[in-house]
A protein has these predicted regions:
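ATP/NTP phosphate-donor binding region
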Residues: 1-59, 66, 70-74, 101-105
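Catalytic core of DAGKc-family lipid kinases
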Residues: 6, 10, 15, 19, ...
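Short, contiguous clusters of charged residues that form electrostatic/catalytic patches at enzyme active sites
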Residues: 41, 63-66, 113-118
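Glycine-rich Rossmann-fold phosphate-binding loop(s) that bind the pyrophosphate
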Residues: 60-61, 84
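Short N-terminal helix-initiation segments at or just after the protein's N-terminus
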Residues: 61-64, 79
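Short active-site-adjacent helix-start/loop capping segments
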Residues: 65-68, 88-90
Length: 150
């Protein structure tokens, strides 16, 4: 299996569990490509060749995961959510094991679920803006809190 892992090291508490997950795949004979997200990364560029992999693993907190999944929308790409954030709400709702070896097995066996994404659009200063989300979207004070936490 060819696996692309896109990881945000700034998510959560900086856990290195994603590397244990990667080792499990490599020891089983799979090929893994790891791309680490920096501050000014372009998700479209990071995921430009996503279709050339058997699975794309998105590793980070809920914000990172939502942004990467939204970037992959409307593309025929199998994805795996790896919980590297603080709350990992989407991951918790999917129901996978958080243990790296178990998650690697599920990934290799192509155990999948379908998940809907939402999209919010608005106009500001004559420009249309669109954002995707996987769990929830907030406005006003909630949005200000989330922006401050990022």
């Amino acid at each position: 299996m060819r696996c692309l892992i896109v990881h945000n090291p700034r998510s959560g508490f900086g856990s290195d569990a994603v590397f244990a997950f990667e080792r499990e795949l490599v020891h089983a004979g799979d090929e893994c490509v790891l791309r680490v997200l920096g501050e000014d990364c372009d998700n479209e560029q990071i995921l430009a060749d996503a279709e050339s992999f058997d699975v794309v693993v998105v590793s980070g907190g809920d914000g990172t995961v939502s942004n990467l999944l939204y970037t992959l929308r409307n593309r025929n790409v199998d994805t795996c959510v790896f919980p590297s954030g603080t709350a990992n709400l989407l991951f918790a709702n999917i129901g996978n094991s958080p243990e790296p070896a178990a998650l690697a097995r599920a990934c290799r066996w192509a155990n999948t679920v379908s998940c809907d994404l939402g999209e919010a659009s608005w106009e500001l200063d004559g420009r249309r803006h669109t954002r995707g989300f996987s769990i929830m979207a907030g406005t006003g004070f909630d949005a200000e809190l989330m922006a401050a936490a990022a």
